[in-house]
């Protein structure tokens, strides 16, 4: 412990002496000071060593300036670290693909400060677009330094995402969608403004008006003992939906046939004897024939009984239900004729 303290004191004295001598010799012999220089370094824990210059003329001609440097183990480690720093930076640049000067600050990274292997993050502090792209293991040469980059990127595999473009897309408002949504207010309400109906669309039932045409001629059905006639109609306010002749049989009327209107066989009594449906002359001419054939009742009269001619006026209830039955038959015939005729037309238009 004592020799070390003595050596430290002696080194301090030498340094002060040579510093004063150097200040005096700086004005007289500046060249000699720069030509010959001796560096003496003392290291604790070992003998002092002197690093002399290899120039023999500097030893004999001009006394050189002596510089004393005190070093310990920590200074040696710091010097070694400083000398190894460029080599470490070089090794880091060859492994990761970016130099030490281009390493961003820790605030630019994520909270944990980690980065996945094989991914180079070029994010900046500005609000510009963020570009993330994966690396490919292709070797590229640098023209300035001659180093080989382990990870070089190609333009074909870059994936860029613009954050500002996403925010700008959300500001676009579809006016057409808002106008259609405003047509409906609360659930259960009716839409306010509807589009104008086209001319080819089906009009509302209030706009349709049926005009009945005159009755057609009687059609005799001698085998069934009936005759029928039909009445056509026209729809005003409807165009292009029904073919011509679709409403030719809008109403159909069925009645027992008469020999005055139908050329049926009287001997077979195909038509019933009804005084209300024939004139007095025709009924009187058939009177003897009727008396001779009272025992034979035709089959169609059994299936379809009629009121006897002796009753002057039927009961009001029977007359009412008869009118109801005739009205229902007319409605059924009109509906069946309309829908059977319009069904193929609507199928074609669809």
Curated annotation (Swiss-Prot):
Main location: secreted
Keyword terms, alphabetized: Phosphoprotein, Secreted, Signal
GO cellular component, one term: extracellular region
Tissues of expression: High expression in testis, but low in other tissues.
Taxonomy, superkingdom: Eukaryota
Record's signal peptide: 1-23
Compartments reported by the entry: Secreted
InterPro entries from the UniProt entry: MENT (IPR029292)
Function summary: Involved in control of cellular proliferation. Onconcogenic modifier contributing to the tumor suppressor function of DNMT3B.
Name listed for the protein in its UniProt record: Protein MENT
Taxonomic classification: Eukaryota, Metazoa, Chordata, Craniata, Vertebrata
This protein's encoding gene: Ment
């Amino acid at each position: 412990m004592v020799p070390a303290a003595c050596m430290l004191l002696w080194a301090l004295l030498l340094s002060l002496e040579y510093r004063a001598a150097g200040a005096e010799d700086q004005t007289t012999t500046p060249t000699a000071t720069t030509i010959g220089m001796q560096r003496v370094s003392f290291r604790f824990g070992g003998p002092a060593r002197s690093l002399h210059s290899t120039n023999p003329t500097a030893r004999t001609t001009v006394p050189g300036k002596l510089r004393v440097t005190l070093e310990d183990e920590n200074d040696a480690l710091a010097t070694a670290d400083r000398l190894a720093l460029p080599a470490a930076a070089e090794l880091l640049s060859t492994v990761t693909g970016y130099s030490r000067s281009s390493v961003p600050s820790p605030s630019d990274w994520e909270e944990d400060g980690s980065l996945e292997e094989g991914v180079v993050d070029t994010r900046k502090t500005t609000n510009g677009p963020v570009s993330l792209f994966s690396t490919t293991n292709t070797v590229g040469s640098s023209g300035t330094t001659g180093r080989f980059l382990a990870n070089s990127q190609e333009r074909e595999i870059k994936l860029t995402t613009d954050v500002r473009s996403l925010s700008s897309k959300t500001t676009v408002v579809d006016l057409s969608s808002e106008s259609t949504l405003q047509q409906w207010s609360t659930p259960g309400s009716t839409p306010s403004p509807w589009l104008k109906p086209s001319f080819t669309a089906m009009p509302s039932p209030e706009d349709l008006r049926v005009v009945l045409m005159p009755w057609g001629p009687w059609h005799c059905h001698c085998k069934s003992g009936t005759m029928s006639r039909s009445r056509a109609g026209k729809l005003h306010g409807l165009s292009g939906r029904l073919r011509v002749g679709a409403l030719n049989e809008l109403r159909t009327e069925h009645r027992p046939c008469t020999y005055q209107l139908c050329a049926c066989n009287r001997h077979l009594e195909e038509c019933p004897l009804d005084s209300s449906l024939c004139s007095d002359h025709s009924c009187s001419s058939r009177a003897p024939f009727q008396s001779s054939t009272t025992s034979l009742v035709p089959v169609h009269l059994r299936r379809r009984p009629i009121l006897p001619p002796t009753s002057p006026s039927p009961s009001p209830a029977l007359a009412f239900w008869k009118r109801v039955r005739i009205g229902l038959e007319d409605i059924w015939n009109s509906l069946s004729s309309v829908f059977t005729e319009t069904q193929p037309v609507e199928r074609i238009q669809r």
